[in-house]
Regions:
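Topology signature of small-to-medium multi-pass alpha-helical membrane proteins
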Residues: 5-192
Length: 192
């Protein structure tokens, strides 16, 4: 649900007097690993997509566990407000889990049809986050900002999955091993 970048932004913007150790080099390490694997079929930005997908699972689990009391009906003024809260959170969580499942299967199956399904799941997740934003704006204004941690990154990943040359070669034409040489020419080795 929440992307890796979104969690970093959220962590950076939180104002707490408590000392919280951070690891600012995490994004640099992710970039180094993903860039270093750019000649692999699942490398470069595509590997970074999976990096944020699985780190998003860890962050979502951590946020869910630390805020589990938010899902208890007794913490709300009325039953209607509790149902609105569930309507604003559960669909986005469910679409994220579906995206995680489809993305994981896509790693081994690598078919164009499954990629199209992944795109539709991301579209549904964005739509759910937009509906969640509308509900939150009316009933839970403190939660509105969190929805943009889903809408913005997922929109960017959707654009990537729609336009990427790598994605087309890996999932549609299945010729990445040939295409990689024109996209990322091998560096000539210096004889010693």
């Amino acid at each position: 649900m929440y992307s890796f970048f979104g969690a970093v932004i959220l962590a950076a913007s939180s104002s707490s007097s408590q000392y919280t150790p951070t690891f600012p080099g995490g994004i640099l390490i992710a970039w180094l690993i993903c860039n270093g694997a750019k000649r692999n079929p699942i490398g470069g930005w595509l590997l970074f997509f999976y990096w944020q997908l699985y780190s998003g699972l860890l962050i979502t689990l951590a946020l869910f566990v630390t805020n589990i009391q938010s899902y208890i009906p007794e913490n709300f003024d009325s039953r209607e407000k509790y149902l609105l809260f569930l309507l604003s959170t559960v669909p986005t969580l469910m679409f994220f889990l579906i995206q995680l499942a489809v993305g994981t299967i896509l790693l081994s199956v690598r078919t164009w049809d499954l990629l199209k399904l992944l795109r539709w799941v991301i579209i549904a997740e964005i739509a759910a986050a937009i509906v969640s934003t509308a509900i939150d704006a009316a009933y839970f204004p403190d939660n509105v900002g969190l929805n943009f941690l889903t809408i913005v990154p997922e929109s960017l990943w959707l654009a990537y999955l729609l336009r990427s040359v790598r994605v087309k070669h890996v999932f549609q034409t299945h010729d990445w091993e040939i295409a990689v040489n024109s996209i990322y020419p091998a560096k000539p080795k210096i004889a010693t």
